[in-house]
Amino acid sequence: MFKIIACINKRGVIGNHGKLLYSIKNDMKNFKSMTIGNVVIMGRYTFESLPKKKPLKDRINIIITKDNEYNVEASDNVFIVHSISEAVELTTTMFSDKEWFVIGGSTIYRQFLDEGLVDEMRLTYVDDDAEGNVKFPMFNTDSWYTYYESLTQTESYFPFTFRVLKKK
């Protein structure tokens, strides 16, 4: 099954105009430690929001796009697919020995949740109410339980917690 990683605030906002809403060092460190050596799955816009539009180093990068002409610089750790089902087939056949992380954006999160493909969400909750134009999709909280929650930390003026939610 797939795991979601996201950083969201009290309003459910995850981004604004192609950029992450928060740059929290501990969140980035946590993200890196979980995903290194594993598979990250993202939509094209999330990929294009990465620094220099380059794949994440030391990870298998799977980019989902509807654009059949979409291409990126040749790399042995980047795969372009055109649907959730193609991403699922690729990960389950070629990368069954790795963990699979869905890293955004909102539409990709929604599709994986709607298909029932996610069994764990690793969320950084920021105690802030900033607005943005990209939100984490609504999900049925009754179907999930909190497996882990960190103590509240503060960095860059924002209190935050790490939570791991697992599917009931």
Protein language model features and the residues they cover:
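Enzymes that bind and transform nitrogen-containing heteroaromatic metabolites
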Residues: 1-168
